[in-house]
Amino acid sequence: GTLNLGMGKQKGDAIAPSGKTVTITSRKMDADPVLITKLFERGKHKIGYLMYTNFTKTFNTSIVKAFNEFKEAGITDLVLDLRYNHGGDDDASTFLCSAIVPKEKAVVGTLLSKETWNSPCQKIFESDPQYENLLNRFFVETNCNLDLPSQKVYILTSGETVSASEYTIACLKAFMDVELVGTKTYGKYVTM
């Protein structure tokens, strides 16, 4: 929408109308969650650094661009900064995992994760004919799998590492070596 604001000037303890009006129009803005990408070299290691602030599948193309640049540079190691990532879309998390887990393990269509709920909820899910798709996540095609030689990822964490970030950490731990650097995550998932 549009909003017209009447401007004023401070006169003592009050604000007096200046007669000027400013019109502002709202606009939806989506910030790219790939906030920073950098390359570092330490000895024989070429390190790709990615600060990722929110899991938003509309920006998977930003992951593709960053990871293809990392691949072109020949990175040996990845530092994934999730310190200020409050989570987001599970599909974006699945995409990111599919791009990081080594190729021989990240086979498109194979199981990435399986959710298990308490007994009453689990029974409700399992009564749905599509429950496999409700509780399970599968590797997807990314066209940017890093296939890191070390099969290890370093993840920077903080108390603001929440939800889909923690889910991503848990999924990556199941398929490769993950070294957490930082403080305890928020604790919505079991990766604390």
Q: Which positions does each model-derived feature cover?
A:
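Bacterial peptidoglycan biogenesis and beta-lactam-recognition machinery
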Residues: 102-109, 173-182
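Gly/Ser/Thr-rich loop/hinge elements
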Residues: 32-34, 90-152
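Short, charged, surface-exposed secondary-structure boundary motifs
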Residues: 188-192
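Mature extracellular/periplasmic domains of secretome proteins
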Residues: 65-72, 99, 139-144, 170-173
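Residue-level recognition of alpha-helix boundary/capping or hinge positions
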Residues: 31, 45, 56, 144, ...
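Active-site-proximal beta-strand/loop segments in catalytic clefts of secreted hydrolases
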Residues: 8, 51-55, 81-85, 111-115, ...
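Flexible, low-complexity junctional segments that flank or bridge functional domains
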Residues: 1-78, 84-86, 91-92, 98-105
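A conserved active-site cap/scaffold subdomain adjacent to cofactor or substrate pockets
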Residues: 149-158, 166-170
